[in-house]
């Protein structure tokens, strides 16, 4: 795992959109079966968008639960919280239920939106082998055989679509504290 993290750091790939960029508009399926449109959400105020690898990732689950604990504060500040992974809607629903999440959990199958945010990388063969040997079938979770993941990332998108905060660490174990994100709203 440390090797792939170092390779991502060294390569500079999937560095993510930065502050001042316009966020790509998107419409994705929610775990509850509805469709969520970013433009519609932005009509109500800023949107915090979290990209995570999948419900199989323990770091992602910790992050999602941390945001759930801060959800009332986020909503008091007039913001909406959205979490996006490449997992199929069924797996997104499992993640939502397992973590008791009361915010949008969206499926970006094929990483279409994550790619627009410049977050997607191809998993190296040695990492695929490790995951397979441990019984983790990322391709089954994602509904394809691409073996691609988004780097975990957090963005604040203002009502005009401008990104006002961007955190895209190369190390998937490093996540920005939700309280820091709330301070930036």
Predicted features along the sequence, with ranges:
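A short, polar/charged loop-to-alpha-helix boundary motif
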Residues: 172-185
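A generic structural motif
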Residues: 29-31, 157
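Short secondary-structure boundary/capping segments
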Residues: 15, 38-40, 145-147
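N-terminal targeting signals for export/organelle localization
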Residues: 1-22
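Short active-site neighborhood of thiol/selenol oxidoreductases, capturing the structured segment around
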Residues: 38-67
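Conserved beta-strand and immediately adjacent loop positions that scaffold enzyme active sites
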Residues: 25, 47, 153
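Structural microenvironment flanking redox-active thiols in thiol-disulfide oxidoreductases
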Residues: 63-116
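Thiol/selenol-based redox catalytic cores and closely related redox-interacting motifs
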Residues: 108-174
């Amino acid at each position: 795992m440390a090797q792939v993290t170092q390779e991502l750091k060294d390569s500079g790939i999937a560095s993510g959109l930065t502050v001042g960029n316009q966020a790509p508009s998107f419409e994705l399926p929610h775990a509850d079966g509805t469709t969520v449109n970013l433009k519609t959400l932005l009509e109500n105020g800023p949107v915090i968008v979290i990209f995570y690898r999948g419900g199989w990732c323990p770091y992602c689950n910790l992050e999602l639960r941390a945001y759930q604990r801060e959800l009332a504060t986020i909503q008091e500040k007039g913001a909406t919280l959205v979490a996006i992974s490449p997992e199929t809607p069924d797996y997104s629903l499992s993640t939502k239920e397992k973590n008791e999440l009361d915010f949008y959990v969206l499926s970006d199958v094929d990483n279409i939106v994550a790619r627009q945010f410049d977050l997607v990388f191809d998993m190296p063969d040695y990492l695929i082998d490790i995951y397979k040997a441990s019984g983790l079938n990322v391709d089954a979770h994602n509904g394809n055989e691409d073996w691609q993941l988004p780097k975990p990332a957090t963005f604040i998108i203002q009502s005009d679509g401008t990104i006002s905060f961007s955190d895209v660490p190369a190390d998937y174990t490093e996540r920005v504290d939700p309280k820091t994100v709330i301070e930036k709203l």
